[in-house]
Amino acid sequence: MEALLIVILVATGVAVGLGQGLLGVGGAFIMVPVMVAVFEHMGWDRDPAVKIAFGTSLLVILPAAVATTAAHHRRGAIWWKAALVMGAAGAAGSLLGSTLTTRVIGGEIMKIVFGVVGLLASIRLVTARPKESPEPSPETPLLWAGVGFLVGLFSGLLGAGGGIVAVPLMVSVLRFRMHQAVATSAAVMVFTTGAGALGYFIHGQGVSGLPEGSFGYFYPVAWLCLAPTSIALTQVGTWALPRVSAGALRIAFALVMVAVGLHMIGLY
């Protein structure tokens, strides 16, 4: 891989880490388009480039989700009973999603779908403010499982953690308090990203024509460029959160997501 491409991926890891630490969202919606562009510049075909970007993205998000979950657990903020139910269902959904993307739908279509979802997510990032229910969260295991499965399906299909859909669903449908939803969502993402990454790895075994250096739908060089910087900068972003304007950051991050979404769709 060219030195410039490595620098681009490392810089992307910095941006992803800051975005996750400051806003709690956005990792995959920055990582995946950059990886696809880098892989295509390296001469890869679009279909494996998209699938490998999805699989690698999930494995970048996984350690960050583990670290975030540990921090929330130390504060006693996670509702573990709900997290385990949603996580188990989410793992099943993520495995199904990774199977659909790698075996049924294909990378060309999923690149466009990813772009559309990125545009919708950018709108939600700026405008949505889920309202908390004044009543305590009820224990509804079947509903937990349903929401977890949907979050996992989203995660596996698009190589994303799923937090951008999990938190509003937990608040509006499951009636979680916001802080409880954010913390529990991190725990659920450990299951969804782990299962999804495993699915992309397994479904990539024995596939002919994959680029040299990839293991299934996973590219270790990209992971090494993205994961350490994103994890480290997540802590910096968390530290900087009280010191910056969250509103301005949301708008700036949303504009970046719009730009990469339009690029993934193919409008420029």
Over which residues does each language-model region extend?
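Juxtamembrane transmembrane-helix boundary motif
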Residues: 1-22, 30-51, 67-154, 172-173, ...
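Transmembrane helix boundary and interhelical junction motifs in multipass membrane proteins
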Residues: 24-34, 159-169
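Residue-level signal for the membrane-embedded core of alpha-helical transmembrane segments
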Residues: 26-30, 57, 61, 117, ...
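Hydrophobic alpha-helical transmembrane segments that constitute the membrane-spanning cores
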Residues: 27, 194-199
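Transmembrane helix-bundle signature of multi-pass membrane transporters/permeases
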Residues: 54-61, 87, 91, 185-193, ...
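A structural-propensity feature for long, helix-poor, extended segments
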Residues: 62-64, 197, 216
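Small-residue-rich alpha-helical segments with characteristic i,i+4
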Residues: 169-191
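Generic hydrophobic alpha-helical scaffold/packing signal
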Residues: 182-185, 191, 195, 229, ...
